[in-house]
């Protein structure tokens, strides 16, 4: 395996390399693969499961021929090592064909066309989140080249998939997906994945700005973190792996992930698998949408692009958002009536747990892993024994990224990773909040006026308030309370 990949990850041998494709036997039958996916609580790599997929040969050159002349939107980002994440709202965008992308990616200095303003040595390009149904709308037969049915999902193919094509350095900021779990098939090139478990949510400083339904972003650039500003990130449990062609990565529900292309051209195909927990998650997302749109639109109605992710067409009105919320709650109850799992009763019996957590909101940044995991995932499922081995490789936890791999393709001496003199963010604000709450309103004003050193910390912006209101832990409690109130 190429340098930088996990030592325990086996190299995938192309079908036919050691014999005819018919001689290959997949290590897991569809039923077993699905059982693993539905029970596994940690990321893992499936090997030798896609050697007979036609999509195995979908490299960028082939796709450029299939999509000849079709305009695709590329996200353009800087090859830099800032401690600030490159969110989609800060990137530029280019409409181009895959042929034009490949020409630009060859680093031709005299290039003209849509990429002419972007120096290949300074910028990366990423055609991300490209849904098959839109990309191949006139070539639907290609849907059959992807066979998620091999993983126990009959009838699931390219129609439920998205395509990702990127250049060296192209990446997705660290985030978690609100819905489902994820299967990612690496077709061409390698990608470096940095993953963090759900219980690390308090240490990743979640934010909903930029706003995108179903995506909770981290304020941290996890490959070059600002530990003075985000000291709790030291507690995060990083899992890292290099995904190679022919491998399929399983990302469990609510695992945070940062993904970066580490080869000149990468092609990936993924599919989000729906889960039972998504019914409650849709209520949480509807609450989030209502709060974000109401507060951010009121703050600056003329500049929605500053806070709305480009994947969202436009901000929705309060009336529309109310409809979304009511529809999500109704769908939840409809599901409960048809499901053998009485989720409402589970919410009721969990009330005592919720009260205990609410009392510890002040210690949000200090909560133990068990408590935060209960809030983040909402369920405590026993982890079934999984047949790990050469064909199912767990993604290992790494206490620290090796210096050569920090920041992916961009070097770093690691000096910015350690801040010995940084203040403890969680304890500082919790103590300050307790002190303020014990005083009268006038005393608070006098304290703020007399202590200029606390002014930057006591100023609360709309985004500061939003980060608290739509924190995944908070919206889950709100969703539970809404449903309890309708079911009593």
UniProtKB/Swiss-Prot annotation:
The keyword Nucleotidyltransferase does not apply. InterPro entries: Cupin_8, HSPB1-associated_protein_1, JmjC_dom. GO terms for molecular function: 2-oxoglutarate-dependent dioxygenase activity. The keyword Transmembrane does not apply. GO terms for cellular component: cytoplasm. PROSITE patterns: JMJC. This is HSPB1-associated protein 1. It comes from Homo sapiens. The lineage of its organism: Eukaryota, Metazoa, Chordata, Craniata, Vertebrata. The gene is HSPBAP1.
């Amino acid at each position: 395996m190429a340098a930088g990949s996990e030592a325990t990850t086996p190299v995938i041998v192309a079908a036919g390399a050691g014999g005819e494709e018919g001689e290959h036997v997949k290590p897991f039958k569809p039923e077993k693969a699905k059982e693993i996916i539905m029970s596994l609580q940690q990321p893992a790599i499936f090997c030798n499961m896609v050697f007979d997929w036609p999509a195995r040969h979908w490299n960028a050159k082939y796709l450029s021929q299939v999509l000849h002349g079709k305009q695709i939107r590329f996200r353009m980002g800087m090859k830099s090592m800032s401690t600030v994440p490159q969110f989609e709202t800060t990137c530029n965008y280019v409409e181009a064909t895959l042929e034009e992308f490949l020409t630009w990616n060859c680093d031709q200095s005299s290039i003209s066309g849509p990429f002419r303003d972007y120096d290949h040595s300074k910028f990366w390009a990423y055609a991300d989140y490209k849904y098959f149904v839109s990309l191949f709308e006139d070539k639907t037969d290609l849907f059959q080249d992807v066979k998620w049915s091999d993983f126990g999902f009959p009838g699931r193919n390219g129609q439920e998939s998205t395509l990702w094509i990127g250049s060296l350095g192209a990446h997705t900021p660290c985030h978690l997906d609100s819905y489902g779990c994820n299967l990612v098939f690496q077709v061409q090139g390698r990608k470096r994945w940095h993953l963090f478990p759900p219980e690390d949510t308090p240490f990743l400083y979640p934010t909903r700005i930029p706003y995108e339904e179903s995506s909770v972003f981290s304020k941290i650039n996890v490959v070059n973190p600002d530990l003075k500003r985000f000291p709790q990130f030291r507690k995060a449990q990083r899992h890292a792996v290099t995904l190679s062609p022919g491998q399929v990565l399983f990302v469990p529900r609510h695992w945070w992930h940062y993904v970066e292309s580490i080869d000149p051209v990468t092609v990936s195909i993924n599919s989000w698998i729906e889960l039972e927990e998504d019914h409650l998650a849709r209520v949480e997302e509807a609450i989030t949408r209502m709060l974000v749109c109401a507060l951010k639109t009121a703050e600056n109605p003329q500049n929605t692009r500053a806070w709305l992710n480009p994947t969202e067409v436009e901000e929705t009105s309060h009336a529309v958002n109310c409809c979304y919320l009511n529809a999500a709650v109704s769908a939840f109850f409809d599901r409960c009536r048809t499901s053998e799992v009485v989720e409402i009763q589970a919410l009721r019996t969990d009330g005592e747990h919720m009260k205990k957590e609410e009392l510890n909101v002040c210690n949000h940044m200090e909560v133990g892993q068990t408590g935060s995991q209960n809030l983040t995932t909402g369920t405590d499922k026993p982890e079934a024994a999984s047949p790990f081995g050469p064909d199912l490789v767990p993604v290992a936890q790494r206490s620290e990224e090796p210096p050569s791999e920090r920041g992916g393709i961009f070097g770093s001496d690691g000096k910015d990773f350690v801040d010995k003199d940084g203040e403890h963010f969680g304890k500082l604000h919790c103590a300050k909040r307790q002190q303020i709450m014990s005083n009268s309103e006038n005393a608070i004003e006098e304290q703020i006026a007399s202590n200029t050193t606390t002014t930057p910390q006591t100023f609360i912006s709309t985004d500061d308030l939003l980060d608290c209101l739509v924190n995944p832990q908070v919206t889950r409690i709100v969703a539970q309370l809404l449903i309890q109130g309708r079911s009593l």
